Curated annotation (Swiss-Prot):
GO terms for MF: 4-hydroxythreonine-4-phosphate dehydrogenase activity; metal ion binding; NAD binding
Chain's gene name: pdxA
InterPro entries according to UniProt: PdxA, PdxA_fam
Note: The active site is located at the dimer interface.
Protein name per Swiss-Prot or TrEMBL: 4-hydroxythreonine-4-phosphate dehydrogenase
């Protein structure tokens, strides 16, 4: 049976943060254990030290490190009790080494997907790795020029799944109008449509797109982008049914109703937000513990929990692993569906 399960790499993230704790908690979950063959990329000593510390503090919902397959990340990081919750240059460098190792092994075909625990971007920068985040490293090392961050969460209330793609990500708000172009939005729509078909089996998707300005520009009174190019681009886009540009404040009403199972609102298969907070504020309000970051456009599946390192919580036994569990389950599900889609395409040729 295990031979049929997808093989996933699970990085430890920053070893001084909550990454090791939520990895141990996630791997103790029977549903996670049954969904994939999981190899942790990091230091076994970090897992063992975290396990001992948390057991001393009364935690019981932990996987035993002795039974966890580990691929040593090559950083040589050693976790002492005094380093827990105190991220530094060494822990930042270690988290980068774990990710790099996982990517290299995935490109060699050893893993069908990567699940990444949280890292601290500022510690990467201090360690000499000036990347905006893990997504950009994944794209560069895999040679992926067109990629995107899709946030996915399934409602525990209704079973409905929200999918939100960001057109722009980690840039200052002042740069958003300068970065948004017809070419960029069209490329993001193409990426989203292709991914909905390949990964989620949605052949004819409906996509809702937010406007950039309040009230989607109010016919040019509150901003020109919608009037001068965005509305026309969406009207003529040929590969999916598009709703928009929609007023950003009211676009999220129907998804919220669907999330909580209120009535039968008209919802899209996916939503395109034009900048970071426009998409992630509603996602985190609805699904902070369940949202998963799915990177589109890579040659393998990559997911991550939608939260940070939480150094202030590390080692206390209180970190919640639900988002990481959801990231693992989604990676396993999509690895299987992606493989099935590839086999179907090959059979048609």
């Amino acid at each position: 049976m295990s031979l049929l399960l997808p093989k996933l790499a699970l990085t430890l993230g920053d070893p001084a943060g909550i990454g090791p704790e939520i990895v141990l908690k996630a791997l103790a979950d029977p549903q996670v254990q049954a969904c994939a063959q999981i190899t942790v990329v990091g230091e076994r000593q970090v897992l063992e030290a975290t396990y001992c510390l948390l057991r001393q503090r009364g935690a019981t919902d932990l996987a035993d490190p002795a039974g966890i397959p580990v691929l040593e990340g090559g950083s040589g990081f050693y976790l002492e009790p005094s380093r827990v919750g105190r991220g530094d240059v060494a822990s930042g460098a270690a988290s980068f080494a774990y990710l790099k190792t996982a990517i290299e092994e995935a490109l060699r075909g050893q893993f069908q997907g990567i699940v990444t625990a949280p890292i601290a971007k500022y510690l990467w920068h201090q360690a000499g790795y000036p990347f905006p985040g893990q997504t950009e490293v994944l794209a560069q090392l895999s040679g992926s020029e067109r990629y995107g961050m899709l946030f996915v969460a399934r409602s525990p209330h209704s079973g409905w799944q929200i999918r939100v793609l960001l057109a722009t990500t980690h840039i200052p708000l002042s740069q958003v109008p300068l970065t948004l172009t017809p070419e960029l939005v069209r490329a993001k729509l193409d990426l989203l449509v292709g991914s909905l078909r390949k990964l989620f089996g949605i052949v004819n998707p409906v996509i809702a797109v937010a406007g950039l300005n309040p009230h989607a520009g109010e016919q040019g009174q509150l901003g020109q982008e919608e009037k001068t190019w965005l509305a026309e681009l969406l009207r003529t886009y040929p590969h999916a049914k598009i709703w928009g540009p929609l007023p950003p404040d009211t676009m999220w009403l129907a998804p919220a109703q669907a999330w909580y199972g209120q009535g039968a609102p008209a919802v899209a298969d996916a939503y395109l937000a034009l900048y970071h907070d426009q998409g992630l504020i509603p996602v985190k309000l609805l699904a902070f513990d369940r949202a998963v970051n799915l990177t589109l456009g890579l040659p393998f599946i990559r997911t991550s929990p939608d939260h940070g390192t939480a150094f202030d919580l590390a080692g206390q036994g209180v970190a919640r692993a639900e988002s990481l569990k959801q990231a693992i389950l989604l990676a396993a599900e999509l690895a299987l569906s992606s493989a099935a889609a590839s086999r179907s395409l090959q059979a048609q040729r």
